[in-house]
Design a protein with these regions (language model features):
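Residues in well-ordered beta-strands of folded domains
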Residues: 11-13, 51, 86-88
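N-terminal leader/targeting segments and the first structural element of proteins
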Residues: 1-44
Length: 92
């Protein structure tokens, strides 16, 4: 599935528990997320949270913001068993 927002295109690369809701994603999306290569959306207490991650090859990214740390982030900061999704930005 292709998602377009603010002239950027994303594809869903992972989804757990029917986590993706396009309407909720578009209403929570902030322009600051445009700079990231990946966006994680997770649900907690009926609220969608969005967090950006960079590609591992991005030398300016801190360790915690690299996509290879996303499983650790899910374990540490998300509710156990929560619904979530991961989007990857499609570069032209």
């Amino acid at each position: 599935m292709l998602i377009t927002i603010n002239n950027s295109h994303y594809e869903i690369i992972a989804e757990h528990g029917d986590g993706f809701n396009e309407e909720a994603f578009k209403s929570r999306f902030s322009e600051i997320l445009n700079r990231y290569d990946y966006i994680l959306g997770d649900w907690g207490y009926g609220q969608l949270r969005l967090k950006g991650f960079f590609d591992d090859q991005n030398q300016k990214a801190s360790y915690d913001n690299k996509i290879s740390t996303i499983k650790e982030y899910l374990y540490e900061y998300c509710n156990f068993g929560c619904s979530y999704f991961i989007l990857r930005k499609i570069k032209k």
